[in-house]
């Protein structure tokens, strides 16, 4: 085993990463730097400092990355109306590039020669983290404990923790019956009962959203203001990116919006069932498509729709830092130059309904041409005859010459 001098660990303070921290110290006899990111997971992160200190850690990094996460990752992704396999809003996928970037930066800052993460050898996160590491620092050493050790179950982790004197709160021991991941964009649930895709998830599982059946009987209207494809104000109040998403999560959760139960194709080859709550993101997606509907040129909109699945797959599979994702981002961002205006949506029992959209500066909707009433000569209907004949020409020729 090659000697490791110092490793930067993505550290939550929970069971898995606490065991990893001790395992790194014992197995590699190396100094460990802990990095804990607040990306809106909704848990107190300062206890991670106390936990790291118990392990004798001298260099501890705890950072509030919520604004950077939404501004530089979530918002750029939503400019593309990004959805993986028709449903998934990529809440887990989009958080990994930022964490990987900060780990590499901290490694460079502290002189560490390795980075480590707590992703298992079965999932997508190991790929997402490590593609990011290598893209940002090609010679970095990566330590993935789940691919090395023999602690293959939660019970074995708990036994190791007890043997090594690793403090784990009883509530952590009992935990949730599901494997969960949360950030400001979503919360996900996997494992246990969900491993049978035919079984409905229990109502008690959902944490962010009320059941649509129990949601308020009165709808709620929201006005969202856009500049260059990003939301800058909600109901007339200017808000930062993280504040926008936080507020939309609260409002969407109140009305039972954003629940999703799906089976997805993982990059590593298997199918996996997951349940997700993305209330704010669901509202953002619907509203963004609405403002684009009146501000984007038709062919630009269609080209974006054609490219979106490829862009979504790049993010899902961990290629955020790849040249092809960056190239697509330039195109996407350029398309948003005129995506300015307002959208009104109605929230009601799990539904997001667009009820209005307007752009005083950039709308391409011309009512004098689109009207069903007298248009005063703005549109000459007779012009359509030649347009139709030219578009039918190839089909007319084929039918005339082939006769079968």
From Swiss-Prot:
Compartments it resides in: Cytoplasm
Pathway(s) of this molecule: Amino-acid biosynthesis; L-arginine biosynthesis; L-arginine from L-ornithine and carbamoyl phosphate: step 2/3
Gene3D superfamilies from the UniProt entry: Argininosuccinate synthetase, chain A, domain 2 (3.90.1260.10), HUPs (3.40.50.620), Single helix bin (1.20.5.470)
SUPFAM superfamilies reported in the protein's UniProt record: Adenine nucleotide alpha hydrolases-like, Argininosuccinate synthetase, C-terminal domain
GO cellular component annotations of the record: cytoplasm
Superkingdom of source: Bacteria
List of residues binding L-citrulline: 88, 93, 124, 128, 179, 188, 264, 276
Family the UniProt entry places it in: Belongs to the argininosuccinate synthase family. Type 1 subfamily.
BP GO terms, sorted: argininosuccinate metabolic process; L-arginine biosynthetic process; urea cycle
Name of the protein in question: Argininosuccinate synthase
Enzyme class: ligase
Principal location: cytoplasm
One annotated GO molecular function: argininosuccinate synthase activity
Record's keyword terms, sorted: Amino-acid biosynthesis, Arginine biosynthesis, ATP-binding, Cytoplasm, Ligase, Nucleotide-binding
Catalytic activity: L-citrulline + L-aspartate + ATP = 2-(N(omega)-L-arginino)succinate + AMP + diphosphate + H(+)
Subunit structure: Homotetramer.
Binding site for ATP: 10-18, 37, 118
Stored CDD domains: ASS (cd01999)
E.C. number: 6.3.4.5
PANTHER family for the chain: ARGININOSUCCINATE SYNTHASE
Signal peptide: none
Residues given in the record as L-aspartate binding sites: 120, 124-125
Keyword Aminoacyl-tRNA synthetase in record: no
